[in-house]
């Protein structure tokens, strides 16, 4: 009797010997519910994947980031199966997992209705309960075309094989550069193919492994993101590892809806988006303008203290500048069309960096001037597609707090350390404190330019700077800008959502393109390194993040109105006007409500406007030179001397405390 062939694998850091034909699931002793897939040599694989000699195997748990992505991708397949069973004429687009959920696009005659979603969700529950198995099989391009002959969008993806991920957002989950694969949903008893889809996987073992899901909404979406293509109907859903996790997520969404900056912007009279201006273009009202002004002034002061020099650049430039910078060859789709003027093409600027390079190049530079830190509140314009424009967080015109630092290679490590500390400290001053860092690097994509060695050096320096902050560091392979690696500061808000805030990017390419030089100590001409940095990302987006973080109740130093005087009767108005005058002398933003409304309504109005302090005054207060001091949360101290009340207000503002 011949011996069973054996394989040597590494499992949880330990070498093991297993029989040939052993699957990842068998090696992991996976239950298919908690451990739902495997990492084999760093690549996610189904539990049914047969192992080879030398494989390194790790578990993927359903409550991990990778595990949730697999869960959501599998749920997208169940969604598509349910739709095609209920709407047989529906043609399939793509259905990837996304942050906190998934979607699938369908070509159907009519948009889906809320009643349709209920029917689809019910059918999904039936499919899940049935326990259909996800089964992977490799197919030739020819066989895939034959099997999917009635799916025109899938056929298009097959023709784009190898470039599908670049051609259509989310298409990378279906078609890669290698052999095509199809996933069948198999009946648990008969093995009959219930449904199939072009897909790279991996997937859950079976549909019963989907613990909790919900369909959320529908939207229109152009195929491959182009308005020249057919408009499809997109169904969004979410899926989680437990029913409690789903409930927590839905509760968070309810709270997020209350904090939606677009809603609060109207309620608090901060900003608006007039139709006459066009999509993605905001106007700030006086109260919003005050908040923005305070944000900018504090940032400006901190930058001046940190050695930055302020500059200003125009909103428009001839095309040649953006050819030199590389933005037209690499970024043209995100720029507005050119304006023809005096025989030349002019573009609204999408980036400030090319103009800062011109400032650097305007005269000879010495090593003694470096690092040179240029800073600007520069307004830029980007052609965001209508489907992704979202209030202030994704606008077409916005102002960046944009800095570009020119330094020597030797100065770069210290400069990045200093810069990252400065960025985090300043964000903390605005009330954000829960951070992690993301390091975006290059991959094998041809979009990345420059020498690999320079990329490696810059990436390692960024990594070391990030590690010194003692924050979690997450790697993002392939997520860098085309010209250099970057660190992104990710911040959690009051309800646990993550926002990308500041970005710090190293750039060896722009100094070459613009032939930037400095005279070194030995008299030679050397090329500086350029560091791009936007601390807020944009003023508008940061405004929106803070508005939602504080649910409109800005800390006193940022509040558009910091104090409101509320007289008990009209004869108390002059007394409060005098208190207001004294506060204004200290720069406090104060109003007196002299309207005919009753006192309780005035208090309610101040609470609705989320004003931090209310000063109430009646006969007793006037006689004692005092006020009733009421906080935003409703707590109140009576008979507070005016001087003490003023000092309390000034202290809270000076210390940037929340009340």
Swiss-Prot record:
Binding site for Zn(2+): 353, 404, 532
Limits of the TGS domain: 1-61
Sequence segments annotated as region (Catalytic): 260-555
Main subcellular location: cytoplasm
Example GO BP: threonyl-tRNA aminoacylation
GO annotation, cellular component aspect: cytoplasm
Catalytic activity reported: tRNA(Thr) + L-threonine + ATP = L-threonyl-tRNA(Thr) + AMP + diphosphate + H(+)
GO molecular function annotations of the record: ATP binding; metal ion binding; threonine-tRNA ligase activity; tRNA binding
Localization of this protein: Cytoplasm
Cofactor(s) demanded: Zn(2+)
Alphabetically ordered keywords of this record: Aminoacyl-tRNA synthetase, ATP-binding, Cytoplasm, Ligase, Metal-binding, Nucleotide-binding, Protein biosynthesis, RNA-binding, tRNA-binding, Zinc
Cofactor binding mode and count: Binds 1 zinc ion per subunit.
EC number assigned by the record: 6.1.1.3
Superkingdom, taxonomy of origin: Bacteria
Subunit structure: Homodimer.
NCBIfam families for the chain: thrS (TIGR00418)
Task performed by this protein: Catalyzes the attachment of threonine to tRNA(Thr) in a two-step reaction: L-threonine is first activated by ATP to form Thr-AMP and then transferred to the acceptor end of tRNA(Thr). Also edits incorrectly charged L-seryl-tRNA(Thr).
Name of the molecule in the record: Threonine--tRNA ligase
């Amino acid at each position: 009797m011949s011996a069973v062939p054996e394989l040597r694998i590494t499992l949880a850091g330990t070498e093991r010997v297993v029989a040939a034909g052993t699957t990842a699931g068998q090696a992991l002793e996976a239950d298919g519910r908690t451990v739902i897939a495997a990492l084999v040599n760093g690549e996610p694989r189904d539990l049914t994947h047969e192992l080879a000699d030398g494989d390194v195997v790790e578990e993927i748990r359903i409550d991990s980031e990778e595990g949730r992505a697999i869960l959501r991708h599998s749920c997208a397949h169940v969604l598509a199966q349910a739709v095609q069973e209920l709407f047989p004429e529906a043609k399939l687009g793509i259905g990837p997992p996304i942050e906190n959920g998934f979607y699938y696009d369908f070509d159907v005659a009519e948009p889906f209705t809320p009643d349709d979603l209920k029917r689809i969700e019910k059918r999904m529950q039936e499919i899940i309960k049935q326990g259909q198995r996800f089964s992977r099989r490799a197919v030739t391009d020819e066989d895939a075309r034959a099997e999917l002959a009635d799916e025109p969008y899938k056929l298009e993806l097959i023709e784009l094989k190898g470039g599908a991920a670049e051609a259509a957002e989310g298409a990378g989950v279906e078609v890669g550069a290698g052999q095509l694969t199809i996933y069948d949903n198999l009946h648990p008893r008969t093995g009959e193919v219930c449904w199939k889809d072009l897909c790279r996987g991996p997937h859950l073992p079976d549909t019963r492994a989907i613990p909790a899901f919900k369909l959320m909404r529908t939207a229109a979406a152009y195929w491959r993101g182009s308005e020249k293509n057919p408009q499809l109907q997109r169904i969004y859903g979410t899926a989680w590892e437990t029913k409690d996790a789903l409930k927590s997520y839905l509760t968070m969404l309810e709270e997020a809806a209350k904090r939606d900056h677009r809603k609060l912007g109207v309620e608090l009279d901060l900003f608006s988006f007039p139709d006459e201006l066009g999509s993605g273009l905001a106007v700030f009202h006086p109260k919003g303008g005050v908040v923005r002004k305070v944000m900018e002034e504090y940032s400006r002061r901190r930058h001046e203290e940190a050695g930055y020099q302020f500059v200003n650049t125009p909103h428009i430039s001839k095309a040649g500048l953006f050819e030199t910078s590389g933005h037209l060859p690499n970024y043209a789709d995100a720029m507005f069309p050119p304006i023809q003027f005096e025989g030349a093409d002019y573009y609204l600027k999408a980036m400030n960096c090319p103009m800062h390079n011109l400032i650097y190049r305007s005269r000879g530079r010495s090593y003694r001037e470096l690092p040179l830190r240029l800073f600007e509140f520069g307004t830029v314009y980007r052609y965001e597609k209508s489907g992704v424009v979202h209030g202030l967080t994704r606008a077409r015109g916005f102002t960046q707090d944009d800095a570009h630092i020119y330094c020597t290679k030797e100065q770069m490590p210290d400069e990045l350390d200093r810069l990252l500390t400065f960025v985090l400290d300043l964000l903390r001053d605005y009330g954000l404190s829960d951070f992690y860092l993301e390091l975006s690097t290059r991959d094998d994509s041809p979009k990345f330019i420059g020498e690999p060695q320079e990329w490696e050096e810059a990436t390692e320096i960024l990594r070391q700077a990030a590690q010194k902050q003692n924050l979690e560091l997450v790697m993002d392979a392939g997520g860098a800008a085309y010209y250099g690696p970057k660190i992104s500061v990710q911040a959690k808000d009051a309800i646990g959502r993550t926002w990308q805030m500041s970005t710090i990017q190293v750039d060896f390419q722009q100094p070459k393109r613009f032939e930037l030089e400095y005279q070194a100590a030995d008299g030679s001409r050397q090329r500086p390194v350029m560091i791009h940095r936007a601390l807020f990302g944009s003023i508008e987006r940061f405004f929106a993040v803070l508005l939602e973080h504080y649910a409109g109740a800005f800390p006193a130093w940022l509040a558009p109105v910091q104090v409101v005087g509320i007289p008990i009767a009209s004869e108390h108005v002059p007394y409060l006007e005098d208190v207001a005058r004294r506060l204004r002398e200290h720069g406090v933003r104060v109003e007196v409500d002299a309207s005919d409304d009753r006192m309780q309504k005035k208090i309610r109005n101040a609470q609705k406007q989320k004003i931090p302090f209310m000063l109430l005054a009646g006969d007793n207060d006037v006689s004692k030179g005092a006020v009733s001091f009421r906080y935003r949360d409703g707590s109140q101290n009576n008979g507070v001397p005016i001087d003490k009340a003023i000092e309390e207000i000034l202290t809270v503002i000076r210390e940037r405390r929340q009340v």
